[in-house]
């Protein structure tokens, strides 16, 4: 079987459900099998995966840092839906400036994107898997 190109869509919050962790495990498995993970699009409550203000207990898995490391090692785009993120208080530096906010909290390695980016991924990747 030839290698496929994937985009994942993560709707589950960083620690509120199992879906984000399952998406991460799926991502690492498909890379190990030789497939390419092009991007992960965080939508709805999934945008909370992109806040740098998440501080899990010392004995818990740090999912945000895991996504960052995966992205850096395998050149994966981490995109949070800008509209969903703003509604949930996940704000990039440029959005903070645009909306007159004094602070921003989008974690390094994540970017904010519109639904057009997800639509493009659906048209160009071999597989789009939603969690």
UniProtKB/Swiss-Prot annotation:
Matches recorded under InterPro entries: DsrEFH-like (IPR027396), Sulphur_relay_DsrE/F-like (IPR003787), Sulphur_relay_TusD/DsrE (IPR017463)
Gene Ontology MF term list: sulfur carrier activity; sulfurtransferase activity
GO CC terms of this entry: sulfurtransferase complex
Coiled-coil segments on the chain, per record: none
Subcellular location: Cytoplasm
Keyword field: Cytoplasm, Transferase
GO annotation terms (biological process): tRNA wobble position uridine thiolation
Principal subcellular localisation of the protein: cytoplasm
Catalytic machinery residues: 81
Enzyme Commission number(s) of this protein: 2.8.1.-
Cytoplasm listed as a keyword: yes
Entry keyword annotation includes Glycoprotein: no
EC class of the enzyme, as a word: transferase
Annotated transmembrane regions: none
Entry superkingdom: Bacteria
Functional summary from the UniProt entry: Could be part of a sulfur-relay system.
Family: Belongs to the DsrE/TusD family.
Protein name from the UniProt record: Sulfurtransferase TusD homolog
Source organism per UniProt: Vibrio vulnificus (strain YJ016)
């Amino acid at each position: 079987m030839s290698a496929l190109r994937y985009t994942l869509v993560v709707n589950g919050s960083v620690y509120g459900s199992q879906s984000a962790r399952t998406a991460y495990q799926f991502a690492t498995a498909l890379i190990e099998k030789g497939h390419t993970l092009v991007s992960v699009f965080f939508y709805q409550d999934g945008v909370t995966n992109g806040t740098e203000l998440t501080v899990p207990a010392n004995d818990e898995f740090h999912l945000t840092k895991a996504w960052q490391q995966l992205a850096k090692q395998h050149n994966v785009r981490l995109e949070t839906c800008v509209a969903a993120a703003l509604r949930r208080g996940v704000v990039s530096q440029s959005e903070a400036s645009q909306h007159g906010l004094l602070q921003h909290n989008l974690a390094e390695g994540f970017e904010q994107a519109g639904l057009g980016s997800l639509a493009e991924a659906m048209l160009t990747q071999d597989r789009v898997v939603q969690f």
